[in-house]
């Protein structure tokens, strides 16, 4: 595209919406005239006639989906005949039925009073009948197609219709998607459920495609329907809101086009993996060469088959995205993967993590440099004319090595010598945050960074946060700044905290009071970081995979209840690996399945470690015994014994368990030959822990525990 079009897409979202309104969306008057004309034609086609047994007419194409561009567009009128008893009948009798439709329409043509101008065309000896409806600013050409009514009197699809579809395709050796027109009513219904602004985004993408067609060879071979579905997928996976940033939306679609070699898009609203015949159709389609975009109404219809056109569109998308600002990202887009984890075969999970979940190493190096500058600046400049001194340490997934490519979180924990205890006054914490906020602003202005450094607006008493973004990639990390009491003091590498560190905390612990479990976990950030940082790289990739899975669950289930924290799954992943594998290299699918099996069995979980605290101290021992007797699941933070991220009934583990159960049917847990992948053997063995001095032994039967100090195991 030329520079004028590139500048168009650089405009703010509100300008794009204005452009759509003024140039892309059909005028209301034109749309109304064409709608009235179409309704009249449909009524005529359904009038009783000796030669026609019409049971209904469906509206399809761009017209039926309500994605018509101003100017010239397309539509389909699907005429269902009652005497067509199976899919293949429409092919056998196409010539005959089109001839009858043509005769009926010509007979009635002179009596019609249409709001739009109509032109009938019958080409190639009645193998094609078209109706062109025109107004002053709009023209829509409708193909008229006879079809078998696959839905019958129902408004929904049925297993029978898809089984019969497969049988008919095999019988007449028709190409996949040959009979997709029979499901036009479902297609119309599918698009009717989406907000009008999403359809405006579709218009913008189709407009971009039209501009591409003007300069590309064979681009017409790709149906616009493929790009419409890709746009719906981008919105569903990345946004889902009725109101959104139009510029972000179009960037997201173009970035997906860039990744066309990995695209695999499908829906399960009309069909799913439950029936064996349909499942086999789906699996065959989803394992075909990319790109794959399945018609949500017909599982045999891959609408993205033309690879040549996709390569050309990829080139155009890359040119557009890179033409905006040299050496800088063209702007934010939604976080949408080109393929779903659910349909990724087990032997390809390592590649999935590498391609889609691991952060870019160059960006990670830039983050490390930026954090080094920021931490040094804060330590040198905060409270320069005061006795208060601070130490800044990094926490969260970035420093632990478990960050995702997008949406990663991290923390800067600020230890100040003015915070003398866990419960230091809140006004002292406020003063620290206020000073850090001022110095962060100074640091951002004075220092040069290889990344974008954005500080959020801070309003006390809310958390102070900032973001580091790549200037080239669609990657970023969000940081929270947390003032904390330095409970560990100058803890030497490899040593464990003094029991006194925890006994002071335990004395504050009152489950029924305002004290929140794990409220002071920031004080133990260094221990949390060290616990994970030393683990094998592949285990960190398993953690990434579980976090990605969790994010999908969170998006799906957020309206139904509060899910347990991601940290719980991180700890379960470590537990599963330590008890079930322990190898540096392992089968990713086996590890993934093992963790999901643990989630399913959440009502029996009791997981804890003794690397930083143990049963040796009496106060700690009594407290730990109380913790591990609590309602399951129990998953204790290895750095903070008051932090139970299992939480018993506190979170909706049952929702996560239900989702995990459904996922056991996914391709993730099938090997190359289609056989089920088994989980690791994580035993539910009797584990014994010592009671208080000489008081006997407390047994927990059929519970799952982990103690890195194996002296407590049977």
UniProtKB/Swiss-Prot annotation:
It is found in: Cytoplasm; Cytoplasm, Perinuclear region. Its EC number is 2.7.7.84. GO terms for cellular component: cytosol; membrane; nucleoplasm; perinuclear region of cytoplasm. Produced as a latent enzyme which is activated by double stranded RNA (dsRNA) generated during the course of viral infection. The dsRNA activator must be at least 15 nucleotides long, and no modification of the 2'-hydroxyl group is tolerated. ssRNA or dsDNA do not act as activators. Strongly inhibited by copper, iron and zinc ions. Partially inhibited by cobalt and nickel ions. Interferon-induced, dsRNA-activated antiviral enzyme which plays a critical role in cellular innate antiviral response. Activated by detection of double stranded RNA (dsRNA): polymerizes higher oligomers of 2'-5'-oligoadenylates (2-5A) from ATP which then bind to the inactive monomeric form of ribonuclease L (RNASEL) leading to its dimerization and subsequent activation. Activation of RNASEL leads to degradation of cellular as well as viral RNA, resulting in the inhibition of protein synthesis, thus terminating viral replication. InterPro entries: 2-5-oligoAdlate_synth_1_dom2/C, 2-5OAS_C_CS, NT_2-5OAS_ClassI-CCAase, NT_sf, Polymerase_NTP_transf_dom. Keywords: Antiviral defense, ATP-binding, Cytoplasm, Glycoprotein, Immunity, Innate immunity, Lipoprotein, Magnesium, Metal-binding, Myristate, Nucleotide-binding, Nucleotidyltransferase, Repeat, RNA-binding, Transferase. Transmembrane segments: none annotated. Residues 11-336 are annotated as: OAS domain 1. GO terms for biological process: antiviral innate immune response; defense response to virus; interleukin-27-mediated signaling pathway; negative regulation of viral genome replication; regulation of lactation; response to virus; type I interferon-mediated signaling pathway. The lineage of its organism: Eukaryota, Metazoa, Chordata, Craniata, Vertebrata. Belongs to the 2-5A synthase family. Its main location: cytoplasm. ATP binds at residues 397, 544, 547. Mg(2+) binds at residues 409, 480. This is 2'-5'-oligoadenylate synthase 2. A lipid is attached at residue 2 (N-myristoyl glycine). GO terms for molecular function: 2'-5'-oligoadenylate synthetase activity; ATP binding; double-stranded RNA binding; metal ion binding. Myristoylation is not essential for its activity. The gene is OAS2. Its cofactor is Mg(2+). It catalyses: 3 ATP = 5'-triphosphoadenylyl-(2'->5')-adenylyl-(2'->5')-adenosine + 2 diphosphate. It holds the Pfam family OAS1_C. Homodimer. Residues 344-683 are annotated as: OAS domain 2. PANTHER family: 2'-5'-OLIGOADENYLATE SYNTHASE 2, 2-5 OLIGOADENYLATE SYNTHETASE.
């Amino acid at each position: 595209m030329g520079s004028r079009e590139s500048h168009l897409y650089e405009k703010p979202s509100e300008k794009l919406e204005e452009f759509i309104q003024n140039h892309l969306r059909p005028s209301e008057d034109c749309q109304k005239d064409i709608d009235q004309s179409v309704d009249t034609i449909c009524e005529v086609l359904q009038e009783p006639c000796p030669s026609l047994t019409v049971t209904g007419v469906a509206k399809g194409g761009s017209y039926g989906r309500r994605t018509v561009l101003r100017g010239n567009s397309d539509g389909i009128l699907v005429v269902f005949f009652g005497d067509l008893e199976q899919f293949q009948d429409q092919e056998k009798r196409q010539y005959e039925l089109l001839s009858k439709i043509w005769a009926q329409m010509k007979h009635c043509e002179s009596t019609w009073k249409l709001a739009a101008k109509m032109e009938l065309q019958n080409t190639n000896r009645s193998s094609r009948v078209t109706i062109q409806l025109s107004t002053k600013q709009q023209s829509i050409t409708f193909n008229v197609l006879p079809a078998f009514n696959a839905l019958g009197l129902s408004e929904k699809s049925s297993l029978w219709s898809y089984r019969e579809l497969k049988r008919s395709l095999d019988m007449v050796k028709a190409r996949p998607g040959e009979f997709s027109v029979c499901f036009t009513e479902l297609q119309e219904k599918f698009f009717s459920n989406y907000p009008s602004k999403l359809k405006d985004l579709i218009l913008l993408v189709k407009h971009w495609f039209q501009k591409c067609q003007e300069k590309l060879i064979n681009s017409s071979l790709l149906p616009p329907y493929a790009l419409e579905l890709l746009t719906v997928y981008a919105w569903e996976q990345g946004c889902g809101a009725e109101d959104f940033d139009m510029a972000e939306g179009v960037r997201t679609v173009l970035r997906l086009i860039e990744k066309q070699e990995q695209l695999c898009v499908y829906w399960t609203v009309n069909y799913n993996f439950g029936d064996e015949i349909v499942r086999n159709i789906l699996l065959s389609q989803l394992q075909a060469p990319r790109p794959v975009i399945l018609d949500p109404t017909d599982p045999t219809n891959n609408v993205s088959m033309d690879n040549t056109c996709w390569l050309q569109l990829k080139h155009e998308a890359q040119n557009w995205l890179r033409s905006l600002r040299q050496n800088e990202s063209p702007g934010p887009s939604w976080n949408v993967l080109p393929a779903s984890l659910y349909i990724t075969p087990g032997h390809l999970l390592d590649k999935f993590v590498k391609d889609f979940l691991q952060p870019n190493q160059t960006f990670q190096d830039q983050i490390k440099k930026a954090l080094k500058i920021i931490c040094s600046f804060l330590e040198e400049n905060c409270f320069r004319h005061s006795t208060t001194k601070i130490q800044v340490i990094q926490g969260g997934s970035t420093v632990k090595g478990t960050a995702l490519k997008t949406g990663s979180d991290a923390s800067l924990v600020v230890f100040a010598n003015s915070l003398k205890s866990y419960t230091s006054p809140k006004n002292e914490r406020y003063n620290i945050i206020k000073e850090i906020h001022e110095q962060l602003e100074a640091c951002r202005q004075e220092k040069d960074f290889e990344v974008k450094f954005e500080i959020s607006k801070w309003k006390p008493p809310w958390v102070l946060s900032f973001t580091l973004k790549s200037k080239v990639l669609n990657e970023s990390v969000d940081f929270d700044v947390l003032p904390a009491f330095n409970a560990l003091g100058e803890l030497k590498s490899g040593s464990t905290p003094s029991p006194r560190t925890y006994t002071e905390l335990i004395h504050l612990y009152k489950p029924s009071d305002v004290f929140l479990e794990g409220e002071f976990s920031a004080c133990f950030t260094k221990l949390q970081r060290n616990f994970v940082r030393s683990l094998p790289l592949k285990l960190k990739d398993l953690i990434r995979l579980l976090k990605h899975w969790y994010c999908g669950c969170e998006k799906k289930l957020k309206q139904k209840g509060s899910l347990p924290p991601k940290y719980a799954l991180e700890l379960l992943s470590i537990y599963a690996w330590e008890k079930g594998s322990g190898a540096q290299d392992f089968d990713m699918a086996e590890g993934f399945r093992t963790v999901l099996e643990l989630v399913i069995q959440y009502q029996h979980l009791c997981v804890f470690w003794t690397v930083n605290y143990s049963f040796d101290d009496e106060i700690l021992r009594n407290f730990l015994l109380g913790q591990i007797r609590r309602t399951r699941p129990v998953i204790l933070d290895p750095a903070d014994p008051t932090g139970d991220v299992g939480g018993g009934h506190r979170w909706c583990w049952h929702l996560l368990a239900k989702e995990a159960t459904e996922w056991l049917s996914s391709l993730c847990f099938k090997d190359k030959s289609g056989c089920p992948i088994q989980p690791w053997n994580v035993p539910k063995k009797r584990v014994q822990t010592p009671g208080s001095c000489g008081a006997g032994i407390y047994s927990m039967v059929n519970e799952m525990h982990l103690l890195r100090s194996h002296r407590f195991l049977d």
